[in-house]
Amino acid sequence: MKKLLSLLCAASLALSLAACGAQAADTNTNTTEPVAGTFYSLENATVLTFTDSGITAQDGSDTGYEIDGTALTITGAGTYAVTGTCADGSITVKKGTTGVTLVLNGLALTSADTAPITCNKSTQVTIVAAEGSVNSLTDSAENNDDEYPDNEAAENAVIKCKDGSQVTLCGTGSLTVTANGKNGIKSGATTAEEGEASLTIRELTLIINAPINDAINAEQTLNVESGTLTISAADDAIHSDLVLNIGAEGTDGPTITVTACYEGLEAAQLTICSGDINITSSDDCLNAANSDLSGYDFTMTISGGTITACSSSGDGFDSNGDLTISGGTVVIWTANTADNEPLDADGTITVSGGTVLAAGGSSGMGMNLEAAQPCVIYGSTGFGGMPGSTQSSLIAADADFTIEDADGNAVYSGTARCGANFILFSSADVVADSAYTLKAGDSSTEGTAQSGMVSTGMGVGGGFPGGGQKPDGEPPESFDGQMPNGEKPELPDGEVPEMPSGERPTPPSGQGRSADGSAPAGDGTSDTTPTA
């Protein structure tokens, strides 16, 4: 079974990468084109209006759907435009129904005990936020069968896409998803019986608040190609058991802002082609992992985009296989403690292009670094202390700093999000065997750029399983690939990472500053928590 899943994972990645460079289609003035390759027209759409008392169809159309009170079931192919406000309603696409376009055109839909939108097994559905429209979907605490086992209607997500469903979320309007039950958006698996499953997000302005579990959770292929996403989650911001693709070659999108989460982006195979990504997490910002660490080739590949990652008590980028950075701009800050590593991989870390600044407490247990593009390393390269212990600092939190070449030219400048005892820097401007000086306040630290295989310590540092899996391989009860409500995986020494505001993170405000605001640059001490 694990071998089959590995093959499916590889096939899904190949298909998604093949589509990565697709060009936008010509604009057709007779249709609305929210994104490349996605067209819809309201001319022949069935218009359905929700109210608290029921659903009405414009012009008396009565084909392709069924109405039961405030529950709408779509039974046939076509375009359905939904609007209105309802305090307890739902939309369901019947199993096996394909060719469905669901246009949200000013819809505010809440459901009391199930998912506001459910795409059943083997469906093909495009959910479009109409141009300029503002839409919202909200569930209740009862939409969680872990907490309410007697609720047979619970779907554990605001938008539930079941096994074998192929769903695209797109449009030039906005959609706010509030998950009071469990997940924001949940996509199912590819199975022999139900067919291939996938979830794609394009162009949409998507806001997800998930105070219980994940914002987006997929069991198969998840493509976030473009759009603007703002996410706050108790657990993962965006998770896929298998393949997660962010962006597309030759494009600028998407823009992803994660204001709070446990882990940021997580998948067995995580690929970032483009985008502007800003993640604030309490554990790993990027994680190549899933709930089962056997039978997969875990990879993290970054070829473009701008990524700013800040972890208060975890690693920056953590791969249970190889980690490759070949382009883009990557800035990572992790808390200045001995067990927080900005870059961590079981396999080889390869830097062959782009601009990389990775700063944190230390290089942990060390890393196997292939510097195809030269890099300069400052500070701790080993254990450096007991897990959780604070390190002396090269830079203090909030300090302005520069990295200069031998002629005094700045090759990088910035402001520290937290104190850091370990800094790795690489860019196209760095020349092997040349000297570079890190300057912060009145202090300076010398370094020499290296290339080829670079050893930073005592060997590779292993990551932990994704999705809440404990190191001993035992999943928690009611396991669905993610952590149960509020739990955190144990570290080998039994220490559990601290999380802000109790068990669930909340959007930070001034996170990471000491009582007096900041430590002075170069004074040898530092805040241990990155600033927001």
Features from the language model and the residues they span:
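N-terminal hydrophobic targeting signals that begin at the initiator methionine
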Residues: 1-2
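A composition-driven surface/loop motif
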Residues: 5-14, 20-532
